[in-house]
């Protein structure tokens, strides 16, 4: 499949997902700016989130299910009401996850240019995942994350404050990424 055909298909899928409300609104401006570059296209994205995940006894990612999630800072009382409503036996984890972008580049030169630009604003976690004849696939993530079993936390206030600051820093980085000429 040619780069042009690949990019057109990805843009059509993005447009359809956006119409259905399936695209994270906090990252739309960045994704659309990246997609304007003829040599880049977004594959998937998330602006970051605070969430409560339930796991089976083996705590495998493949068995994880969302119990609650917030794309941005969360109110402590709202969080605690949701947390204390949990009555299931599966273990619950509190997680703060940074933004994540999966981007395809037309070629290695375009991928290198993209990665150099994200490094200039302080994003450390990004690189090439796979290379194919017509494209280079990259993953980029923010730097801040937390993952703890919810039953190990005695006082939620300080942890929620830290999580909210992490989400604010995360959104600040996304705004810096939006200002880059892709």
PLM features per residue range, with description:
Residues 1-86, 161-182:
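N-terminal, charge-rich interaction modules
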Residues 102-104, 139:
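Structured core elements
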Residues 98-100:
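Short, solvent-exposed beta-strand edge segments and adjacent coil->beta transition regions
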Residues 84-95:
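Short, flexible, solvent-exposed loop/turn segments with mixed acidic/basic and small polar residues
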Residues 117-182:
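Helix-rich interaction surfaces within compact, conserved domain-sized segments
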Residues 105-110:
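Helix N-cap motif at beta-to-alpha junctions
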